[in-house]
Amino acid sequence: GNYVSKAGKNITKGDDTKDYRNSSGLLMGEDGGPEYLTVFNGETGAAMQTVDFDPPRSILTSSKWGDSYANRSERYLAAVAYLDGVHPSVVMTRGYYTYVYAAAYTWDGTDLKEQWLSTNTPTEENGGTGCTVKYADGTSKNNTNKTLYAQGAHSVSVADVDNDGYDEIIFGSAVLDHDGTVLTYDGRG
C-alpha cells in the first residue's frame, strides 16, 4: 500500500497497485514482490525511512528453503541487541530448519543502515560454504566449519554469552557473535 511505497524520505518504493500473489495466493520467489523494513516515529506513527528488506525471498528457490509453498522462506524473527556494546541494533532473521539469513541494522535518527548480512549454508564438509558475513564496507568473513544451517528454533534470544561487552544472538542451538559470524553451534538443531 501507499504507506509502504511512499514511506519516509524515500520518494517511491515499489508498485502499490500490483498483485504479487501467484495462482495459489502465495508470495514466492522473484515474482513475490518487494519487501521493506520501515522505521516509524513512535510518537506520531509517521514513516521515517524505508529500505529494502535483506535478504529478499528470491535469494533462494523454494526447494532450497526446504519446501515448495513458501513456509520456511517466510519465517522471520527479530531482536534488539547491543552489538557494539552501546547502541541498539535490530537483527532480522529469515528462514528456519535449513538456510538461515540474519541481518543487523542501525538507526542513527536519520538513516537506517545495514551493518552486516550473515548467510548460513551447510558446512563445507556437507557441501556448503558454512557462514559468510558481508559487511557494509564491502568486506566479508567466512567460516566453512560453523553455520546456523539446520540449527533453527521458533525464537531468538539476546545475551552477552562470551562476556566481551557485546550482545550475541542465540538462534536455537547456535550463537551468532556480535559481528555476524557463528560463535558456536552444536550441530543438533
Name these PLM-found stretches.
Residues 1-189:
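Beta-propeller-forming repeat regions
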